[in-house]
A protein has these predicted regions:
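Positively charged n-region of N-terminal signal peptides that target proteins for export
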Residues: 18, 39-44
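Short, positively charged and aromatic/hydrophobic N-terminal segments
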Residues: 13, 18, 25-26, 32-35
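N-terminal secretory signal peptides
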Residues: 67-90, 95-98
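Extreme N-terminal basic, low-complexity initiation segments
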Residues: 2-8
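Carbohydrate-interacting regions of secretory-pathway proteins
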Residues: 64-68, 77, 93, 102-106, ...
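Bacterial N-terminal signal peptides
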Residues: 46-57
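Sec/Tat signal peptide C-region and signal peptidase I cleavage site
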Residues: 59-63
Length: 362
């Protein structure tokens, strides 16, 4: 990592960050400054398991639906350790970490040079470490640097010196966005009448497995969703759903927090394109999709003359920019055609929750 690049990163201000209320910013007091040379050595510490092994370990599908997984009040002792951590190493170099709960006190940590995805990370090589919980501390193995989480802080120790970064809760800049004048409000927490089928929880959230009554051609969509906390599930069995534009083109919904970011993971256009960046937040944290969809065009005989196109922002970050959709995506309810289609929120045997859904026709 070059010093100029590091300096630029240090000046960045990420508007998504909100410090965890129990975290303590000890970086300024540590007085420990890492040189570029030391940081290069740090970035080349033991890699732990590879991304391929991580994906292999997270690819088992479990079918039974656990409704309690959608309830933030019914989490296990591991939940408070899962999440994002971000800060500066010795006041010079930004770093981010995503900690994934795997059940039974086991964890995976992904370490990002430069900061978290969408907040400083620019595609450099990531590092992965396995961790285990003992009481109120999670300790990670691998490399010559000690790594542990306690009290809302991720601490690194090496050669008798240490530094810490804080647990960070990010919020999408479009979270709770109000529908503009003229928008079609599909769900505002008062009733599920605009969806057939459509079910609402007692606390006013839309459940998975919903089809909008209204149908649309070209439009802009704002949608907020929350993944359930399912640490023992893996791959496509972990918080799986989908947001289908016109019931034809799916933007995948999945707990792929910390994973590579593939077409069948959160933000992916299923079977067509990976997201440019994996912006998936941790389970039980509200997320946003802001989608600009242009419907396919057909002539008077029903022959397609132009493919549909889509632009997607996930948690405020552009992940698809005017992408052409040459076909309908896998498992879409409707075939391609000139007719308008409905918004389909897939039921894939996981308890997803949705809120604040509205559409602006183009």
């Amino acid at each position: 990592m070059e010093e100029k690049t590091a300096a630029r990163r240090l000046t960045r201000r990420n508007s998504l960050y909100e410090k965890h209320p129990n975290s303590v910013d000890s970086l300024g007091r540590a007085g420990y400054r890492f040189s570029t040379q030391v940081m290069l050595k740090f970035s080349r510490l033991s890699m732990g398991l590879t991304a391929g092994l991580l994906l292999a370990g997270l690819n088992t599908v479990s079918a039974a639906k656990n409704v309690d997984a959608a309830d933030p009040k019914k989490v296990d002792a591991d939940f408070k350790f899962q999440g994002e951590y971000a800060g500066s190493l010795g006041g010079q170099y930004d770093v981010g970490a995503q900690v994934i709960a795997l059940g039974g006190g086991k964890f995976k940590m992904i370490l990002y040079p430069g900061g978290l995805p969408g907040a400083g990370y620019e595609g450099e090589e990531k590092r992965e470490y396995d961790g285990a919980r003992d009481g109120d501390t999670v300790t990670f193995t691998g490399g010559t640097t000690g790594k542990s989480i306690s009290g809302g802080k991720l601490t690194f120790e090496r050669d008798g010196q240490s530094f810490s970064i804080d647990r960070t809760i990010r919020k999408s800049p479009t979270l709770s966005a109000k529908p503009p004048e003229g928008a079609t409000v599909l769900f505002n927490g008062k009733s599920a009448k605009n969806f057939k089928p459509g079910k609402m929880t007692e606390d006013g959230l839309l459940m998975e497995g919903a089809n909008s009554v209204a149908k649309f051609q070209s439009h802009k969509l704002h949608l907020e969703f929350r993944l359930p906390y399912e640490p023992t599930r893996r791959g496509q069995g972990r918080a799986n759903s989908g947001c289908y534009l016109q019931a034809r083109y799916e933007v995948q919904v999945l707990d792929s927090f910390g994973l590579a970011g593939k077409h069948n993971e959160c933000g992916g256009i299923y079977s067509i394109k990976d997201p440019d960046l994996n912006m998936c937040f941790p389970p039980l944290q509200w997320q946003t999709y802001d989608i600009d969809f242009t419907a396919a065009k057909y002539d008077k005989d029903g022959k397609k003359t132009a493919n549909a196109r889509i632009t997607v922002r996930h948690n405020g970050v552009l992940i698809h920019d005017n992408v052409e959709l040459p076909k309908r995506t896998t498992a879409s309810p409707l075939a391609e055609g000139p007719e308008p289609g409905f918004l389909h929120l897939q039921d894939h045997s996981n308890p997803l929750r949705f809120r604040n859904i509205w559409v602006v026709k183009k």
